C-alpha cells in the first residue's frame, strides 16, 4: 500500500517581489560596510535539495543562537503562482527553535548588530556636549519598551537635528538612505560599476525592506 503523502506547514510572510532588494542590502552590508561581516548568505544555487528556497541569510547571535531568514519562491505551482514569494524567519538556540515575527527579529538583530547610543552619551547630554554616537537601528526599538536613557537621547538628538548641527540632520536621513541604497544595488551588475552609496546608512529593518506589514 502506497504511503500517504505528509505535509509540513510552516508560518511564512508573503511578500512582493522585493527579495532582490533584500539580497542586495545584505551583500552591501556584508562585503562593503562590514556591518554584517559575520552573516552567512546562501544563494539559491548553493541551497541544495530545497528547490523552493531561493536564499538563506543566517545571522549569528549571542550565546550560540542564530536567526535565519529563508526566502521562498515557486509557491503553489499547481495554481500557476510561480512568481509568488514569501519568507520564513526562525530563531534557533542550542536546544530550542521557533518562528518569530519581523518586529521581534529586528530586536534580536539589534542585540548583536548595528551600534546604538553608548553609555557615555548620557553624561555628554547632561553636560550639554555634542553626542558622538547614534542608534543605527532605530526601528528595532519600535515594539519594545525603551529605557529612559534611550528616550532622553532620542529627544536630544531630535531637538539638535532641528538646530545648526548638520551631523544630526545627516543621521536622520540614514534610514531613507538605507532603503535607497538597496533599490539602487538591486538593479543589476551595471549599477555595481558606478560610485558606491554613502557609507553609514541605517538598517531599515526586515519588515521595511521586504514590504511586510508588521
UniProtKB/Swiss-Prot annotation:
<dbReference type="GO" id="GO:0044423">
    <property type="term" value="C:virion component"/>
</dbReference>
<feature type="region of interest" description="Disordered">
    <location>
        <begin position="179"/>
        <end position="204"/>
    </location>
</feature>
<keyword id="KW-0946">Virion</keyword>
<feature type="modified residue" description="Phosphoserine; by host">
    <location>
        <position position="147"/>
    </location>
</feature>
<dbReference type="GO" id="GO:0016020">
    <property type="term" value="C:membrane"/>
</dbReference>
<protein>
    <recommendedName>
        <fullName>Virion infectivity factor</fullName>
    </recommendedName>
</protein>
<dbReference type="GO" id="GO:0019058">
    <property type="term" value="P:viral life cycle"/>
</dbReference>
<keyword id="KW-0472">Membrane</keyword>
<comment type="subunit">
    <text>Homomultimer; in vitro and presumably in vivo. Interacts with viral Pr55Gag precursor and host APOBEC3G. The interaction between Vif and APOBEC3G is species-specific, which may play a role in restricting the replication of SIV to their host. Forms an E3 ligase complex by interacting with host CUL5 and elongin BC complex (ELOB and ELOC).</text>
</comment>
<keyword id="KW-0597">Phosphoprotein</keyword>
<feature type="short sequence motif" description="BC-box-like motif">
    <location>
        <begin position="147"/>
        <end position="156"/>
    </location>
</feature>
<dbReference type="Pfam" id="PF00559">
    <property type="entry name" value="Vif"/>
</dbReference>
<keyword id="KW-0833">Ubl conjugation pathway</keyword>
<keyword id="KW-0945">Host-virus interaction</keyword>
<dbReference type="GO" id="GO:0030430">
    <property type="term" value="C:host cell cytoplasm"/>
</dbReference>
<dbReference type="GO" id="GO:0020002">
    <property type="term" value="C:host cell plasma membrane"/>
</dbReference>
<comment type="function">
    <text>Counteracts the innate antiviral activity of APOBEC3G. Forms a complex with host APOBEC3G thus preventing the entry of this lethally hypermutating enzyme into progeny virions. Functions as an adapter molecule, recruiting APOBEC3G to the ubiquitin-proteasome machinery. Targets APOBEC3G for degradation through the assembly with elongin BC complex, CUL5 and RBX1. Binds viral RNA and affects the stability of viral nucleoprotein core. May play a role in viral morphology.</text>
</comment>
<keyword id="KW-1035">Host cytoplasm</keyword>
<keyword id="KW-1032">Host cell membrane</keyword>
<feature type="region of interest" description="Multimerization">
    <location>
        <begin position="154"/>
        <end position="166"/>
    </location>
</feature>
<keyword id="KW-0832">Ubl conjugation</keyword>
<comment type="similarity">
    <text>Belongs to the primate lentivirus group Vif protein family.</text>
</comment>
<dbReference type="InterPro" id="IPR000475">
    <property type="entry name" value="Vif"/>
</dbReference>
<feature type="short sequence motif" description="HCCH motif">
    <location>
        <begin position="110"/>
        <end position="141"/>
    </location>
</feature>
<keyword id="KW-1043">Host membrane</keyword>
